[in-house]
Regions:
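A conserved short helix/loop substructure at the end of the activation segment
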Residues: 195-197, 209-222
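Structural motif at the C-terminus of the N-lobe alphaC helix and the adjacent alphaC-beta4 loop
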Residues: 1-7
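Conserved end of the kinase activation segment
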Residues: 120-132
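Conserved C-lobe activation region of Hanks-type protein kinase-like domains
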Residues: 142-203
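Catalytic-loop of the protein kinase fold
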Residues: 67-88
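Activation segment/activation loop of eukaryotic-type protein kinase catalytic domains
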Residues: 83-120
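Conserved structural core of kinase catalytic domains
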Residues: 7-59
Length: 223
């Protein structure tokens, strides 16, 4: 069993009076789905009025730790996105929809396009995913949480151009020795300025994970 507050692990198998299986007893995962509030400043203020940038940072740390915990148990989330994680007012997180988790040789058969690692090809259930795939999805999720919903590959241009940039791992933000190609500019939104205020090590880690397309084995396990 996974003994961690970030996962509602089944406590008991339930049967009817004829000893037929009817379900499982699980702890309640309280909170609000991350995608409901975190990507808009107004919604965040409405949901958690006392939260500041400090609380968002703490939330990101808790998300990273929760993914790391599951990886230690050999579990790959697979379909990691803001709709399958519940957030409480104290910043604690609970992963839900665990029926799509990849456990041992049972693949995750679903996925969410925006959080899909660019090296994916074919149907989701045709291959086993790795920690590296989760790390990519987590990096997108952390970036969007810190920038109030701005996609890391969003740029001044069309939606098709953003998708192509994600496929090739081309960011419109500089980090380490990486410089964006000519003409790649972030969209003119408040979130674009967050990048320059992030600690250098965090910028480098996120940038590396999001642009490491050809050599995905070089992505760290988790941040």
């Amino acid at each position: 069993p996974i003994r961690s507050p970030c996962v509602a692990w089944p406590r008991e198998i339930l049967y009817d009076e004829l000893r037929r299986f009817v379900g499982v007893l699980m702890p309640r995962a309280d909170g609000v789905p991350l995608g409901v509030f975190a990507f808009h400043a107004e919604l965040l203020k409405k949901q958690f009025p006392s939260w500041t940038r400090y609380d968002l940072t703490r939330l990101c740390l808790n998300l990273s730790e929760a993914v790391h915990t599951l990886h230690r148990y050999g579990v790959i989330l697979g379909d990691l996105h803001p709709g399958n994680v519940m957030v409480s007012s104290d910043g604690s997180v609970h992963w839900i929809d665990a029926d799509s988790f990849q456990v041992e040789d049972y693949p995750c058969s679903v996925g969410t396009e925006r959080f899909r690692a660019p090296e994916f090809h074919g149907n989701y259930g045709d291959f086993l995913r790795t920690r590296s795939h989760d790390t990519y999805s987590l990096s997108v999720l952390l970036f969007m949480t810190l920038t109030f919903g701005l996609s890391p590959f969003a740029r001044q241009g069309s939606e098709e151009e953003m998708q192509e940039a994600a496929r090739k791992g081309v960011l419109p933000y500089p980090f380490a020795s990486y410089k964006p190609p000519a003409g790649f500019y972030p969209p003119d939104t408040p979130g674009r300025y967050v990048w320059s205020y992030l600690p250098r090590k965090l910028r480098d880690a996120l940038g590396h994970n999001l642009t490491c397309v050809q050599r995905r084995d070089l992505r760290p396990r988790v941040m």
